[in-house]
């Protein structure tokens, strides 16, 4: 998908800005190719690349995303921000590096972004939102205004964050969840309203046990 994003960025300009040369992948042999281009090698090949190179790390797991970036030691590597031509960006006074903003995302005003965040299709980031590093927003996440989001959080498809909340670090918010309260760190939440997924499982097993006893 990010290779297609790069192609869209190039097509939107009179002069293409990027020369896409291929992929680096630890899990795919360099003898294999993707439809969009060749696999050039693994992270060891990347770390010994001899010339300047711009890369983007496109991984949907915050933990893995950070691990890969931490293991890239080549000083010739840089991390541009990639923004789809259809994305709407009103005002982002502060932005880091390596962010991926895909089609139909909307960013309004007075937003501060860290680095290496991935914003999938249709994500909405409104006024006065602060976002840290290595967060992954799946399609159609809706963040309300004046929200603080820390680092390494995973937001499921179509989840919603109500205004003025704080989301800590290393949280996993399930698809379709509605977050009505601030979240500390290292939580897995699910549902509307979003609650600890462990509590949901406990309630499920309680109901199942009760039904079995009734029989």
What does each model-identified segment do?
Residues 1-32, 47-49:
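Hydrophobic, well-ordered beta-alpha structural blocks that scaffold small-molecule cofactor pockets
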Residues 3-8, 67-71, 113, 184-185, ...:
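Short amphipathic alpha-helical segments
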Residues 121, 133, 138-215:
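Glycine-rich hexapeptide-repeat left-handed beta-helix
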Residues 18-20, 52, 76, 96, ...:
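A general structural motif
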Residues 61-115, 119-129, 141-143, 147, ...:
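Left-handed beta-helix
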Residues 28-88:
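Phosphate-bearing ligand-interacting subdomains
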